[in-house]
Amino acid sequence: MFFFANCPGPCFRENQAIADILREIDDPNFVAVSLTCDPDNDTPAALAHYADRFEADPQRWKFLTGDMDVIKRVGTKTFLLPVEIGVHSERGAVFDRQGRLRGSYHLLQEDRVNRLKKLIRDVLAEEDVAAGAEETD
């Protein structure tokens, strides 16, 4: 998801939703990424401090920053979302291990979060089946 640490709006609640999902789906193959849309202010140190507010496990939840032009390209080409400084979506997206976008859902609507969790579980189950098949060859 795209966010910024000083957001006066929904970003904290969106990241809280991700924290809740990570607690519920306790699978090491499920990794969440929160990508800032304010890289000038959201330095790695600032993001580390922000992540601490959620007791984020850095192995399972990445808070990322970078060059704004690259972040914009990732938003439009990968997430299919427009991204500008201070402008972001309230959506969480699911990608499989092949990097394919499988779906995105609004993080502040309970019914949508439930669908997001189902999709995550479905994708993890697909990966488990694939991993199991690979192990037997």
Give residue ranges: language-model regions.
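Thiol-/selenol-based redox modules, centered on thioredoxin-like
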Residues: G86-D137
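Structural cue for short, hydrophobic secondary-structure segments
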Residues: M1-F3, S34, V94
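Short active-site neighborhood of thiol/selenol oxidoreductases, capturing the structured segment around
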Residues: M1-I18
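Structural micro-motif
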Residues: W61, T78-A93
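Alpha-helical elements of the RecA-like P-loop NTPase motor core of helicases
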Residues: G9, A45, K72-R73, G103, ...
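Structural microenvironment flanking redox-active thiols in thiol-disulfide oxidoreductases
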Residues: R13-V74
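Short, surface-exposed amphipathic charged segments that create phosphate/polyanion-binding patches used
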Residues: G75-L81, G99-R100
